[in-house]
Amino acid sequence: QKVVGIDLGTTNSAVAAMEGGKPTIVTNAEGQRT
C-alpha cells in the first residue's frame, strides 16, 4: 500500500510519500521542499 500526503498551505504547499515506514518530503526540480 502506498500513501501520499498533501499539505495545501496558503503560501506554500508540500507533498510527502511514505518510504520504509517514514514520511519523505517530495522535492521539486530545484530541490526545494515547497
Swiss-Prot record:
PROSITE patterns according to UniProt: HSP70_1
Record's subcellular location: Plastid, Chloroplast stroma
Primary localisation category: plastid
InterPro entries per the UniProt record, alphabetical: ATPase_NBD (IPR043129), Heat_shock_70_CS (IPR018181), Hsp_70_fam (IPR013126)
GO molecular function: ATP binding; ATP-dependent protein folding chaperone
Keyword Chloroplast among record annotations: yes
A cellular component term, taken from the record's GO annotations: chloroplast stroma
Lineage top rank: taxon: Eukaryota
Keywords in alphabetical order: ATP-binding, Chloroplast, Nucleotide-binding, Plastid, Stress response
SUPFAM superfamilies on file: Actin-like ATPase domain (SSF53067)
Protein family membership: Belongs to the heat shock protein 70 family.
Reported function: Interacts with newly imported chloroplast proteins to assist in their maturation.
Protein name in UniProt: Stromal 70 kDa heat shock-related protein, chloroplastic
Taxonomic source organism: Cucurbita maxima
